[in-house]
From Swiss-Prot:
Its cofactor is Mg(2+). One of its GO terms (cellular component) is cytoplasm. Keywords: Magnesium, Metal-binding, Thiamine biosynthesis, Transferase. Condenses 4-methyl-5-(beta-hydroxyethyl)thiazole monophosphate (THZ-P) and 2-methyl-4-amino-5-hydroxymethyl pyrimidine pyrophosphate (HMP-PP) to form thiamine monophosphate (TMP). Pathway: Cofactor biosynthesis; thiamine diphosphate biosynthesis; thiamine phosphate from 4-amino-2-methyl-5-diphosphomethylpyrimidine and 4-methyl-5-(2-phosphoethyl)-thiazole: step 1/1. Its EC number is 2.5.1.3. One of its GO terms (molecular function) is thiamine-phosphate diphosphorylase activity. It holds the Pfam family TMP-TENI. It catalyses: 2-[(2R,5Z)-2-carboxy-4-methylthiazol-5(2H)-ylidene]ethyl phosphate + 4-amino-2-methyl-5-(diphosphooxymethyl)pyrimidine + 2 H(+) = thiamine phosphate + CO2 + diphosphate; 2-(2-carboxy-4-methylthiazol-5-yl)ethyl phosphate + 4-amino-2-methyl-5-(diphosphooxymethyl)pyrimidine + 2 H(+) = thiamine phosphate + CO2 + diphosphate; 4-methyl-5-(2-phosphooxyethyl)-thiazole + 4-amino-2-methyl-5-(diphosphooxymethyl)pyrimidine + H(+) = thiamine phosphate + diphosphate. Binds 1 Mg(2+) ion per subunit. It is an enzyme of class 2 (transferase). Belongs to the thiamine-phosphate synthase family. This is Thiamine-phosphate synthase.
Length: 209
């Protein structure tokens, strides 16, 4: 698969987007500089997830941005998403690869150095590592810190996307580790200024030296 731009990886949040126009929210994030969109919903019916995924895929296709579905391979297949992102307790990566083939993207969450080492021999396109900072969007997240991220950057053979509590205030410190790919949730969808929030993150990344 052609290497994709993982630099500003935006993940949806069902609580933050509750009652809002999903198409408009995703379009604003993309207009602000998002390079990947991941749809994550843990507490919705399959029917509702399918309906929302169809909408998100439509806007991602309009702007030629990769669309990833969190966990649910069935939803990803149903809407012909570009790929899936799996957690450590989700479907085995090698099984997912057999189902999806090598044209689709598979990402894998990692929390520990051991997870990263194991992922090196798995058929994944990138890994997510974190939580790098304390986060409010995942209650069970383990805080890893920047020193661990530095280790991961040296060990991983796949592109690394840092995740967890990343915002305008700590992004520069994160970039100093050498990591150039970040996943964000609240930093983008915390209020109605989605495009502006995304633009500020993008500007920090582009101006970092």
């Amino acid at each position: 698969m052609e290497r994709m731009d993982l630099s500003l990886y935006v993940i949806t949040d069902e609580k933050l987007l509750e009652g809002k126009d999903i198409y408009s929210c995703i379009e604003q994030a993309i207009s602000g500089g998002a390079t990947v969109i991941q749809y994550r919903a843990k507490n919705k019916s399959s029917k509702k997830m399918y309906e929302e995924a169809v909408v998100i895929k439509k806007v991602c296709r309009k702007y030629d941005i990769p669309f990833i579905v969190n966990d649910r391979i069935d939803i990803a297949i149903a809407v012909d998403a570009d790929g899936v992102h799996l957690g450590q307790d989700d479907l085995d990566v090698e099984v997912a690869r057999r189902i999806l083939g090598f044209e689709k993207i598979i990402g894998l969450s990692t929390k520990k150095i051991e997870d990263v080492i194991k992922a090196n021999s798995l058929p994944v396109d990138y890994i997510g590592f974190g939580s790098v900072f304390p986060t409010s969007t995942k209650e069970d997240a383990v805080y890893a810190g920047l020193e661990k991220l530095k280790e991961v950057m040296k060990i991983s053979v796949q592109p690394v996307v840092a995740i967890g509590g990343i915002n305008e205030k700590n992004l520069t410190d994160l970039l100093k580790t050498g990591c150039r790919n970040v996943a964000v949730v609240s930093a983008v969808f915390k209020d109605d200024n989605i495009k502006e929030n995304t633009e500020r993150l993008k500007n920090i990344m582009e101006n970092f030296t």
